[in-house]
Amino acid sequence: MSVISKYVSLKNYIPTGLPKETDFEIKSKEISINDEKNILVSNSWISVDPYMRARMTERKNYKPPFKIGEEMEGYAIGKVELSNDKDFSVGDLVFSSLGMRDKFVCSSDELKKLKPIDMPIQSYLGPLGMTGHTAYIGLFKHGELKSGQTILVSSAGGSVGSTVCQIAKNLGCKVIASTGSDEKVDWLKNELKVDHAFNYKKVENLVLHFKEICPDGFDLYFDNVGGDFLESAIFQMKTYGRIVICGRISQMNATNPGSGLKNMAYVLVKRLTIKGFLIFDHDNEREPFETEMSKWLADGKIKFKETIYEGIENAPKSFIDLLNGKNIGKMLVKIDFRKFVIKKPQ
């Protein structure tokens, strides 16, 4: 049996600047199971994440560049359509890193069977997936956040940032949230109940703004953007404060990345700790996160919002819009229009 797979490929590398839809191509090819790749999967949901931008250049990074003309990759949830593997059955819902395509064939070691949950399956790409895990590990392992502390979160209207805000509130922290639109400010204030949210695009001087809204300073800054925002935050960190570097979305597409931080003296004077981390280094640390996040979700203490584009043809647009900040919460591409919910056995 063979089927046609539609997929997104990169037409050329993008060393600087924002990607354009013309940098991508929707292609098709015939696929079929064989002795080595003996499972056929149809994707239902594809995760769209900022880290993918780093794979669109030829520069050495923590993941290799996408191959020109071949299938791009990304996290996805799908359903087994055909299987010659004893461990997977038709209808099984699975997680893989073989996104950016509607169908694929693979071996069993490329799939993870999903556990039963009483919520939509795309939660495994959001609060129960890399999004939630990144927020959890960043806050507790690297940020060492404690109850009652004050935290600044940039890109707080995105998937990771909004999860960081809610975990910190659950811990009894004061949360200052920065985002790029009034709509996101409203969501952060009125639904997620952060202590203060602001649209950074409307702030003329971030350093003065930080002094005004948080005169005592920040214990922790969860940095998703880098650049000038990071430099401004350093001025208002408390002595022995911590800065966790999770992303640098403000610089990913810059044609001129600038000269770097000009206030490193404050890192010395304030005895700050600045630490970067990659969630890919923590795959073996999921159990405590999954237990706690599942409880928060069940208790309604973590809310998640999604921005959804339909069809593999719209995957390039979804990625470009993500980089332009047009998403609220998690950016997803919906491939299979059937709605799957995994139910726990009664």
Describe each region flagged by the PLM.
Residues 131-134, 159-160, 228-229:
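Hydrophobic/small residue at the entry helix of a nucleotide-binding pocket
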Residues 72-79, 90-155, 301:
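NAD(P)H dinucleotide-binding glycine-rich loop of Rossmann-like/cofactor-binding domains
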Residues 30-48, 56-100:
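Glycine-rich beta-strand-centered segment in the early N-terminal region that forms part
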